[in-house]
Amino acid sequence: MKRIYKLIFCVIVMGFLDSGCGTAYKVVMDQRNVKTQAQDEKIELTIRKKLADSDQVKLFDISTYCFNGNVYLVGEYDVSSQKGDAVKLAKQVEGVKSITQYFLPKKAGDHCGTSDNIELAVKVTANLVKDKGISSTNIKVKSVQCNIVLLGLVGSKKQITKAVAHAKSVIGVRSVKSYLKVF
């Protein structure tokens, strides 16, 4: 029970930091100019709205990220057609240059649930924040079925290598997929 309370606290803190408290800091620390950041945010929100309005795709199963017009769709699907539907909806959005997808089929009886995914993402993020040699505010961490996906723009290949190593060091992580790019 104590673990659940810790987890809920971490989720609330992460949401608070992500929603506004850290926004000004993130804008300043981001490698992209403010206009590009705004365009990317608009693309993300537009895709999320399209996913929410869709009868075929489940919004909460897919996360959307955008960096310099390059979109990343990350999540799970019940039936294979949901992947194509999500990509088709994302392609309709103005400003999208490319779409990269990381989808896993939902597995009945998988022992990695929502709380496990949240816990792993929080632990990986904490490892990244502790390392002052990494621009952690520029890295998004998503866990899907206990597989970590790293996304964002960083300053060097060394930062990418370190970020992947930090993610792999967390107990319970099944695999790490990096979509990190050097800005």
Spans of features found by a protein language model:
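N-terminal targeting leaders
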Residues: 2-6, 16-183
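Classic N-terminal secretory signal peptides
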Residues: 11-12
